[in-house]
């Protein structure tokens, strides 16, 4: 009495909101890691709103703001193994990001950087924060930077990237003392 279990697929992405006319990349994971896109069949619930290519890149058509689409990934060798991911188009993209904060920090101290995100009404203004070197300074999803001992005397760059597919980002250099 042998029962075969379906591999559990999960689609991951950096966002669920993408500006109309822009794109985002999705990945499929199983318990054993990331699935090679060539082993998947990607489909869009509405090609008039957004298309998806064989690499998992979803491209929203222009003037689709407010509309949603469900992207499905199916394993080529097991059509019963599939996952879905809902995305919504925003009317306008992010046009600019500026970061404010202190340009120098002492080791073991923290500061919260502020990202001013500009865009017309309806833009998705959430950003992803990253550090150029997590051994020198870390940054949380809220922009909280902590200077680490290994970074003493170094300079680190903190980046705030728009998640809406606009490609907009801002960089902020901090000297660690």
PLM-predicted stretches and their roles:
Residues 1-177:
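Extracytoplasmic soluble-region selector
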């Amino acid at each position: 009495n042998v029962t075969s279990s379906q591999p559990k697929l999960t689609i991951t992405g950096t966002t669920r909101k993408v500006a109309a006319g822009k794109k985002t990349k999705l990945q499929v994971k199983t318990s054993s890691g990331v699935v090679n896109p060539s082993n998947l069949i990607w489909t869009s619930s509405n090609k008039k709103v957004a298309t998806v290519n064989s690499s998992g890149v979803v491209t929203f058509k222009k003037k689709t703001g407010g509309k949603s689409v469900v992207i499905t990934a199916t394993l080529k060798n097991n059509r019963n193994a599939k996952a879905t991911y809902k995305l919504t188009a925003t009317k306008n993209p992010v046009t600019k990001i500026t970061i404010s904060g202190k340009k120098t920090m002492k080791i073991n101290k923290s500061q919260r950087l502020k990202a001013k995100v500009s865009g017309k009404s309806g833009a998705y203004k959430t950003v992803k924060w990253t550090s150029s070197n997590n051994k020198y300074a870390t940054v949380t999803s809220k922009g909280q930077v902590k200077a680490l001992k290994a970074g003493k005397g170094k300079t680190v760059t903190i980046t705030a990237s728009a998640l809406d597919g606009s490609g907009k980002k801002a960089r902020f250099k901090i000297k660690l003392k």
